[in-house]
Swiss-Prot record:
InterPro entries: PEP_COase_arc-type (IPR007566), Pyrv/PenolPyrv_kinase-like_dom (IPR015813). HAMAP family: PEPcase_type2 (MF_01904). Catalyzes the irreversible beta-carboxylation of phosphoenolpyruvate (PEP) to form oxaloacetate (OAA), a four-carbon dicarboxylic acid source for the tricarboxylic acid cycle. It catalyses: oxaloacetate + phosphate = phosphoenolpyruvate + hydrogencarbonate. Pfam families: PEPcase_2 (PF14010). This is Phosphoenolpyruvate carboxylase. GO terms for biological process: carbon fixation; oxaloacetate metabolic process; tricarboxylic acid cycle. Homotetramer. Its EC number is 4.1.1.31. Signal peptide: none annotated. It comes from Methanosarcina acetivorans (strain ATCC 35395 / DSM 2834 / JCM 12185 / C2A). Its cofactor is Mg(2+). Belongs to the PEPCase type 2 family.
């Protein structure tokens, strides 16, 4: 990178992906202390996005850090809330979170001259206007705090979270245009500016391979900005432990840090802290502090063009299958446990994730590839569950989503882009792909999966697996205990998957218990 990063290295988050532990909002301030003192994280993200987090949680965390530790919030450990989107949820909730940021900073400045909260995350970002409007709200709240309480704080800076594949492909342009417009609106340009890239939602919409390539395309573009602009850009990369959501765990750490060179901060989510072996999370934190940031790999114009066409091909093949599975995924996801206090899925306080606008990908793809991608998209939004439960549902029927569309897309890429493009995919663009798929084979059971799929859908999935075995030499090595649980629960799971949740309470509890046990075996809910 062009400059030495001074950003935090490990952001502890409140993602509900632990299979072994439910954590209430009342426990989360203590969790923040644990993140810093036990796990060694240098950043914690109170999460208000689609979540019933009390507004005063920011204040509680900052106060407890001051009272119970020797750590100085804003210096030794950073508190970086994720505020709700004014577009996807509502502006009132966003403003209330911003007021709590001001209150937390007011309390911290009574103990020291260090401001506790200096940044906040804005989810599902798609436009410059969203970013600037949210930043303006923070400016307005800061001015109100100064007027009403007589204290001046440095206005916390927004971290846009980019979560879908089309936006990831335009992350560089979005960031550059934001910084140019920032100067016009606020009169200055920030010295530092972080961008948060999400692996999970882009995988949900476009599949594992297209998601990974989109994230790497975004990392490449944002790294280029570090050489082109005065502002120092930093990258937060959000990843879970299963491959579909990023494959960030201790065993895969070497692959992960090589794959995503250029990022400056990782997320340490709940599954790694509570569902993996004791000591794994601490070891990964130490490793991240040692390695981050690594020098990014920059792609040529020709390589970027090839990446986009690969994204289009893999996204198409994934989308054609996933839309056939939507109803099954939704029914099964309802049976997976809630591990955090979520808002309702739909309504004034919650939201559902809908299909992204793919014009940003189609316009970059080769014409024939773009047309096929466009045609593969469902006519109506599928309203799929959040990424963790989406992933967990597919793992729970013996069909890890990493496989969906991947084999057919690999063959199609070879036909349309050539053998050399496929070779570059496996050796340069996504060298960890084979490792990811080998991990997922431990939870693959086509016999079980067939009971949830239509005949045509099962034929396509079987073809994917066959191609991957032949092309990549994958070896299926099912986890014995996992397979037993899959087989044992089939009648009840099939009922849940095809007939709605019309089961008595005793059977429902048995199904939920077994799904949770499977999550514990794979060390993540999803």
């Amino acid at each position: 990178m062009s400059r030495k990063s001074t950003y935090p290295k490990v952001m502890c988050t409140q993602h509900p992906d632990s299979a072994s532990r439910y954590i209430s909002t009342q426990e989360e301030p203590g969790e923040a202390i644990e993140a810093a003192v036990v796990f060694g994280c240098d950043e914690y993200m109170p999460d208000y996005e689609g979540k019933a987090t009390p507004y005063h949680q920011n204040v509680q965390i900052v106060s407890r850090l001051i009272e119970e530790t020797d750590l100085v919030p804003g210096k030794d450990v950073f508190i970086t809330p994720r505020a709700p989107s004014a577009v996807q949820e509502n502006r009132f909730r966003q403003l209330m979170v911003m007021m709590s940021i001001a209150e937390a900073n007011h309390g911290a400045l009574e103990y020291s001259d260090v401001q506790a909260i200096n940044e906040f995350v804005h989810p599902m970002t798609g436009t410059v206007r969203e970013i600037l409007d949210a930043q303006q709200h923070m400016v307005d709240v800061s001015e109100l705090a100064k007027k009403e309480f007589g204290f001046a704080m440095e206005v916390p800076r927004i971290i846009p979270l980019i979560e879908d594949a089309p936006a990831l492909l335009h992350a560089k342009e979005l960031t550059e245009n934001t910084l140019l417009a920032w100067k016009e609106r606020f009169g200055t340009v920030p010295e530092k500016f972080r961008v948060f890239l999400g692996k999970s939602d882009s995988a949900l919409s476009f599949g594992h391979v297209a998601s990974t390539l989109s994230c790497k395309y975004a990392i490449n573009g944002l790294s280029e900005l570090n050489f082109e602009l005065e502002t120092e850009t930093g990258i937060v990369f959000g990843a879970g432990t299963l491959p579909f959501r990023g494959h960030l765990d201790l065993k895969n750490a070497e692959n992960f840090f090589r794959e995503y060179r250029g990022i400056g901060t990782i997320t340490l989510q709940s599954a790694l802290r509570y569902s993996h072996e004791k000591g794994d999370a601490e070891a990964l934190v130490d490793l991240a502090k040692e390695k981050l940031p690594e020098i990014p790999e920059l792609f040529s114009a020709e390589e970027k063009e090839e990446l986009v066409n690969l994204i289009g091909i893999f996204g198409t093949r994934y989308s054609l299958i996933i839309r056939e599975l939507a109803s099954t995924i939704n029914r099964l996801s309802d049976l997976l446990p809630q591990q955090r206090d979520r808002l309702m899925h739909r309504g004034s306080g919650g939201y559902s994730r809908s299909a992204p606008d793919i014009s940003g990908i189609v316009s970059l793809c080769r014409t024939d590839i773009g047309k096929e991608l466009l045609a593969s998209m469902p006519a109506e939004d599928l309203h799929l569950p959040r990424a963790i439960k989406f992933t967990g549902a597919l793992y729970s029927i013996g069909l890890p989503p990493e496989f969906i569309g991947t084999g057919a897309a690999l063959n199609e890429a070879r036909e349309k882009l050539g053998d050399e493009a496929c070779e570059r995919l496996l050796t340069k663009y996504f060298p960890s792909l084979v490792s990811d798929l080998n991990f997922a084979t431990g939870y693959l059971d086509l016999n079980v999966a067939s009971r949830f799929l239509s005949g045509a859908c099962f034929k396509e999935v079987s073809k994917d697996i066959e191609i991957l075995h032949e092309t990549l030499g994958l070896e299926t090595h099912p986890e014995p205990s996992y397979r037993i649980l899959l087989e044992m629960m089939q009648p009840e799971l099939l009922q849940a998957g095809t007939s709605g949740n019309c089961m008595d309470e005793e059977v429902s509890q048995l199904v939920c218990s077994t799904l949770t046990k499977m999550g514990k075996i794979r060390k993540a809910l999803g």
